[in-house]
């Protein structure tokens, strides 16, 4: 009986750790912390990527040449 309870507790803890890691990865993607972001004066496309890194936004003054510019703390 103790073995069954111990096995259930261990499997619950393992599942909790796996779930926490997958949620953390999902949050990184949702927050835009992706590896495919580009910096200032780099070409971007808000609708399909590459996306601007945090602190920059994509502006399209001369389509299709959209570039990332600093958001100056907006």
Curated annotation (Swiss-Prot):
Disulfide bonds join 37-53, 44-58, 52-68, 60-66. Residues 21-34 form a propeptide. Keywords: Amidation, Disulfide bond, Ion channel impairing toxin, Knottin, Neurotoxin, Presynaptic neurotoxin, Secreted, Signal, Toxin, Voltage-gated sodium channel impairing toxin. Its main location: secreted. It holds the Pfam family Toxin_7. The modification Asparagine amide is found at residue 72. Expressed by the venom gland. It is found in: Secreted. GO terms for cellular component: extracellular region; host cell presynaptic membrane. The keyword Ribonucleoprotein does not apply. It comes from the Eukaryota. GO terms for molecular function: sodium channel regulator activity; toxin activity. Residues 1-20 form the signal peptide. The presence of a 'disulfide through disulfide knot' structurally defines this protein as a knottin. Belongs to the neurotoxin 07 (Beta/delta-agtx) family. 03 (aga-4) subfamily. Aga sub-subfamily. Insecticidal neurotoxin that induces an irreversible spastic paralysis when injected into insects. Modifies presynaptic voltage-gated sodium channels (Nav), causing them to open at the normal resting potential of the nerve. This leads to spontaneous release of neurotransmitter and repetitive action potentials in motor neurons. This is U3-agatoxin-Ao1h.
């Amino acid at each position: 009986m103790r073995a069954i309870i111990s096995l259930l507790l261990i499997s619950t803890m393992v599942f909790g750790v796996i779930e926490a890691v997958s949620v953390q990865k999902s949050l990184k993607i949702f927050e835009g912390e992706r590896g495919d972001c580009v910096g200032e004066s780099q070409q971007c496309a808000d609708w399909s990527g590459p996306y601007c890194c945090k602190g920059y936004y994509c502006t399209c003054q001369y389509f299709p040449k959209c570039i990332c510019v600093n958001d100056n703390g907006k």
